[in-house]
Curated annotation (Swiss-Prot):
It comes from the Bacteria. GO terms for cellular component: cytosol. The keyword Zinc applies. The active site is at K129. One of its GO terms (molecular function) is DNA ligase (NAD+) activity. It comes from Allorhizobium ampelinum (strain ATCC BAA-846 / DSM 112012 / S4) (Agrobacterium vitis (strain S4)). Residues 641-719 form the BRCT domain. This is DNA ligase.
């Protein structure tokens, strides 16, 4: 791992969005190598770390989840070796929890969303999280029809012939089973069978396999079903897709139905009614983990009643009614050989510990994040001491390294007894190591305290920031220019040739013109390019001369403005001209424009201030002005279409709702394309008022907003 990453808890929304783009590309690459070619180039643990970082970021920023998120697809898109099957119901992923407190928060969120008091106990099921390959098996008229891998969550590979070789999976269901049944579960290889297979491979002088999960996945994708049959794969059923009729009203009842129909179900599954019982069962499974003949990496909790699952519904990527409680991270000891500083797109200076190579959880670790200057000193973001004796981290120290949800491990603590006598305190740089500009810690306007992050003040003068900004600009959820990847951006940015250099985003759109005017430096003659690839690059650039407003705003790289915030802004202002005018009018940070900006649901004072500061900076205005000469941002209405009667409308809920909780009403409105705001303004389209409505109702009447009852709202949305 050449570069350290900012820890999840220190990411801004903007940084998180960019990191999710990087992770999606990396995981898709490794999925394609493994699932498409059966040629993995990283270990199982390293792959898991990528997935865990992605999940950790999405758990902290759930609104940033994109359509190509690994949590939506878990695996590669079908590679073409097998035919494809579209799942009748998508195979989604679960959110992860890592502590008892996280589990308690999950349970509390269920009660809170449903509007149920804790003394009305809700039952949960708890089952081991099998470390295998997810599978959906479809039966029609009780005969096994098809079997598909999870694939990208929407489309999987047809592995029916290979599934038929797994003796534990019935080919025919009993007479009481519905006409259409999709049973979902996990295909896995027992540890004992894995060890026996590797012993056989070693005896034959062949390369052994890495772990049971990867072996099971590769075995299931064999073109010769006889090979699959020889691998002795097994199956646990725990979920379902399409069902013509439901055989039970609870999760536990469904599992019992699977058992009656002849499917193996996990014997450690329990039905529990309190956080204490859930945690106790987690501990019990953890104690048995080493003795089980199959790999598990946690325990999955689900709300038992299916009607409550339906009410809780889904976030954009995962159910609200389930979570996966992962087992603890692994730790190891090593030595800090050096501390380097990396500069990010927003100027953040992130210290990175260069470590003596050590294996943690099956992965060789050479780098670990040190978060920020305070962390090196043993101080947390709130000013508290984060190590037992408040000691600092120094070059030469023996440290405890942990791998958890992050790709890059963290240095947890220092072994003071092994500290060299010659060690000296690390001095955090006061200037940027890239451009030499002052490095400062900004004061938080709300708390009055210094931010934990030290930032370079160089802006676009700093080559590290400028280059990273271009990478952000061309990224998937911004301008998404095919052919301008990391290597290509590095090449163009570092070039000193006027016909090739790209130092700011507008330079991308003048590249073709500069190439046509040059008689000397032809891009097609440079190693790594060529006539066809150059033509495709220019076509890709020209295809982005018109772009959706939300993508344009996101691409500007405004600090704290991530993909979701950009969508909110595009929906609220409609056109770039209106958006830019509003930012200028809001610059004094008071008045109607400022208040309107702050009233947009999901945008607070910190984000609003960052936006108006961006548009006050002359250098930014100059770059945007040049960009607008090359690119046309399309009005939001021109790129947003929906049959929903409330799509694009702004809705405010006030008073008591009788049919739904406030969270349920908000989730339903947003799923139909509406924007739910927290306060009434001239931009509000509907105010849904229940009993006890107060000042918001008065304000709505004052500014002429349409007011409706809960029943009228439900009639409007067709509920």
């Amino acid at each position: 791992m050449a570069d350290a990453l900012i820890p999840v808890e220190d990411l801004s929304e903007e940084q998180a969005g960019q990191e999710l783009i990087r992770l999606a590309a990396a995981i898709a690459h490794h999925d394609a190598l493994y699932h498409g070619k059966d040629q993995p180039e990283i270990s199982d643990a390293d792959y898991d770390a990528l997935k865990r970082r992605n999940d950790a970021i999405e758990a902290r920023f759930p609104t940033l989840v994109r359509s190509d998120s690994p949590s939506q697809r878990v695996g590669a898109a079908p590679a073409g070796i097998f035919s494809q099957i579209t799942h009748a119901r998508p195979m989604l992923s679960l959110d992860n929890t890592f502590s008892d407190e996280d589990v308690a928060d999950f349970v509390a969120s269920v009660y809170r969303f449903l509007g149920v008091m804790p003394d009305n106990s809700i039952a949960f099921t708890a089952e081991p999280k099998i470390d295998g390959l997810s599978m959906s098996i479809r039966y029609e008229h009780r005969k096994l029809k098809t079997a598909a891998t999870r694939g990208d969550g929407t489309t999987g590979e047809n592995v029916t012939a290979n599934i038929l070789t797994i003796k534990e999976i019935p080919t025919e269901l009993p007479a009481d089973a519905p006409d259409v049944v999709e049973v979902r579960g996990e295909v896995y290889m027992a540890k004992s069978d894995f060890l026996a297979l590797n012993a056989q491979m070693e005896a034959e002088g062949r390369q052994t396999y890495v772990n049971p999960r990867n072996t099971a996945a590769g075995s299931l994708r064999q073109l010769d079903a006889k090979v699959t049959a020889s691998r002795k794969l097994k199956f646990f059923a725990y979920a379902w897709g399409e069902m013509s009729t439901m055989p039970a009203e609870t999760q536990s009842g469904m599992v019992e139905a699977f058992k009656r129909w002849g499917f193996p179900v996990n014997p450690l599954t329990r039905r529990l009614t309190s956080v204490e019982e859930i945690i106790a069962h987690y501990r019990e499974i953890g104690l048995q983990r080493a003795d089980l003949d199959y790999d598990i990496d946690g325990v999955v909790y689900k709300v038992d009643r299916l009607d409550l699952q339906a009410r809780l519904g889904f976030r954009s990527r995962s159910p609200r009614w389930a979570t996966a409680h992962k087992f603890p991270a692994e730790q190891a000891f090593t030595t800090v050989e050096a501390i380097d500083i990396q500069v990010g797109r927003t100027g953040a200076l992130t210290p990175v510990a260069r470590l003596e190579p050590i294996t943690v959880g099956g992965v060789v670790v050479t780098n670990a994040t040190l978060h920020n200057a305070d962390y090196i000193e043993g101080i947390g973001n709130g000013g508290e001491r984060i190590r037992p004796e408040g000691h600092d981290i120094r070059i030469g120290d023996t440290v405890i390294v942990q791998r958890a949800g992050d790709v890059i491990p963290q240095v947890l603590d220092v072994v003071l007894e092994k500290r060299p006598e010659t060690s000296v305190k690390y001095e955090f740089p006061k200037t940027c190591p890239v451009c030499g500009s002052h490095a400062v810690r900004e004061k938080n306007e709300k708390t009055g305290k210094l931010d934990s992050v030290t930032r370079c003040t160089g802006g676009f003068v700093c080559s590290a920031q400028a280059k990273e900004h271009i990478k952000h600009f061309v990224s998937r959820n911004a301008f998404d220019i095919e052919g301008l990847g990391t290597k290509q951006v590095d090449f163009f940015f570092e070039s000193e040739d006027p016909a090739l250099m790209i130092r700011t985003a507008p330079d991308i759109f003048t590249l073709k013109q500069r190439q046509e005017a040059s008689s000397l430096t032809r891009l097609e003659n440079i190693d790594g390019f060529g006539r066809v690839s150059v033509r495709k690059l220019f076509d890709a650039i020209d295809a982005r001369r018109e772009i959706a407003l939300n993508r344009f705003i996101f691409a500007l790289g405004i600090r704290h403005v991530g993909e979701t915030t950009a969508k909110l802004l595009a929906r609220s202002y409609g056109s770039y001209a209106a958006f830019a005018d509003a930012m200028q009018e809001a610059a004094p940070k008071f008045g109607e424009a400022w208040n309107e900006l702050n009233s947009i649901d999901g945008i607070g004072e910190v984000v609003a201030a960052s936006m108006v500061e961006f548009f006050k900076e002359p250098r930014n205005l100059e770059v945007v002005s040049r960009l607008l000469k090359e690119v046309t941002p399309l009005d939001a209405e021109a790129v947003t279409a929906s049959d929903s009667p409330v799509a694009g409308k702004t809705v405010v809920f006030t008073g008591s709702l009788e049919r739904f909780t406030r969270d349920e009403a908000k989730a339903r409105a947003e799923s139909l394309g509406a924007k739910v705001a927290g306060s009434v303004s001239k931009k509000t389209d509907y105010l849904v008022a229940g009993p006890g409505a107060g000042s918001k109702l008065d304000k709505a009447r004052e500014v002429g907003v349409t007011v409706m009852t809960e029943d009228e709202w439900l009639a409007l949305i067709g509920w």
